[in-house]
Amino acid sequence: MQESGAQEKSLAKTTYKEGFGLFVKGQIEESIALYQKAIEIDAKLAIAWNGLSVALAKQGKMKDAIAAAEKLVELEPEDPLSHTNLSRILMQNGLIPEAEDARARAMGLQMKQSET
């Protein structure tokens, strides 16, 4: 059973990497499909949620991008980069107060991490 879980995680990461390869080539729609497939395989694969949020934002699908970025923050609440990503997407959508809140959380986490 554990081996199957490890295989799924590996497949999800491989699928994410394929999606990222397409993203950097400008094949955004195709990358979104692969990010979504990676998430179907492993819903806790944070990097896939990050990639999905960025790709959706690039397409102007801001509501979906925000939802994906919020899921990333839910999965990695102590990671400043998760909050920074959410802040950037909120800013792109004109949600300035919300973006500033997310940025402040990111900065607070960065300061906390630098103290340890």
Range-by-range predicted roles:
Residues 25-34, 59-71, 93-105:
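Structural signature of tandem alpha-helical TPR/SEL1-like repeats
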Residues 8-41:
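Alpha-helical segment of the N-proximal tetratricopeptide repeat
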Residues 1-12, 88-116:
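Terminal, low-structured helical/coil segments at or just beyond the last alpha-helical repeat
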Residues 37-58:
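Short, charge-rich amphipathic alpha-helical segments embedded
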